[in-house]
Amino acid sequence: MKKRILSIVLCLVMVFSLLPFTASAASNTPINDMNFPDPVFREYVRKIAGSSVLTEEKARQIEVLDVSASNIKKVLGDRDPITSLRGIRYLKYVKDLNCSGQKLTTLNLELNSRVEKLNCSGNQLTDLWLDPRGNSLKYLTCSVNELTALDLSKSPELTELSC
């Protein structure tokens, strides 16, 4: 009987000792060159986060992400074009994404299933990946790119397409 109680207590201690670590790892993402390798995208995310760490609370507030060339110029001044949106997966609550006029060659939104409106026109995209389990995409503008194929089979809510 004592062994059983001891086993239960040890299991509970193990579970509760892992909770704070797991919670902090999931809710705080450093905005650094490892998570956001493109320097301009990283600078923009730092600006909208108001910090060098993206908290879960702040990520929830970011539903509109405008990293279009014109908005970057307005917010940050003259900068080189963005070539990668790697790290966008940490902005999982974004519903409206505008990344037009940059120099993106790939755009991976497989972990951004909440995106409803996407404007990625005027890039050099050869690949656009959407969540293969399904997504919320309603409006897609992807003209002036180098896409040769686009799988929209998991986008049942799509009502407007301009490519």
Task: Describe the role of every protein-language-model region.
Residues 87-89, 107-109, 130-131, 150-151:
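Leucine-rich repeat
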Residues 5-10, 16, 21-96, 113, ...:
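N-terminal capping/linker segments that flank leucine-rich repeat
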Residues 65-68, 75, 97-99, 116-120, ...:
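Conserved hydrophobic beta-strand positions in leucine-rich repeat
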Residues 7-9, 141-144:
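Short helix-onset patch at the extreme N-terminus, typifying the N->h transition
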Residues 1-2:
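N-terminal secretory signal peptides that target proteins for export/translocation
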